[in-house]
């Protein structure tokens, strides 16, 4: 075929899980379903220029620089997807990627990175093959994203997304994420203020953490809990019960870190200032009745979730009481968004 262009570009956001997944089966399948808010301002933009080649090859740059430390993970990713995207076998790719937020500063970037890369690759495949069409484009992108990073599958849609088979959401799948239709027009748009407690690289990778769930003493209990919490979360959103929503989100965050601390070997990823922030948030909520809750990724940073209508009061609270616990006073304000955009 004759191509009218040889470059594609997408930007895709990160996401914050409300229902966490922790542990994997074979082939990048999660141990339990997960549900997340898609973010808006924390995104990765990826561009790929390509030419025909005798065999597959790629060059990768991040913010204009070669990053050898990224190559092993990319090699694994491309080895996983080559059967799904046959056109890649005869292409040479020049990949350029950048984040809107600081890399290695405690913000999980694999979700935005692999989802933006997957969207570009799916668009390229659609130029050479009829297996990609308008109806399955984003589903295929979510599938491919999962093979790079499980959480990346959820970044393909917004504002609320589910990855993993569950009776709660018809059409849900272990292979890709689906958008959740919020059946409540009164459910507020949420903000996510990310408090940077630790900017360093995690001592224990999420990959190792997932592996430690294989023989975890609480493995089966966690699977049951995640399904129960998913049901509670769905009901809280549909009934506009923010108190119940907050309870589930915080329970999931604390459970995630409890699983880390009770694995063998065990490990702790939060820091003293993580606890300081949580204690101040709970006290602030009790004293002011502000609708605000915390959640945590597999790290030390704290995500504050609250309705957009409370933005100013929460900003004042952060600057007055929480910024002292942030690494060099850093925090990032984001909000729930609608998903990826074509550049």
Predicted regions and their residues:
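C-terminal nucleotide
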Residues: 2-27, 51-52, 57, 182-343
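Gly/Ser-rich oxyanion-binding loop with an adjacent helix/lid
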Residues: 83-187
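Short amphipathic alpha-helical segments
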Residues: 66-73, 113, 137, 273, ...
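Short beta-strand scaffold segments in enzyme catalytic cores
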Residues: 17-20, 44-49, 152-155, 159-162, ...
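ATP-binding N-lobe of GHMP and related small-molecule kinases
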Residues: 1-105, 119-130, 134-135, 331-343
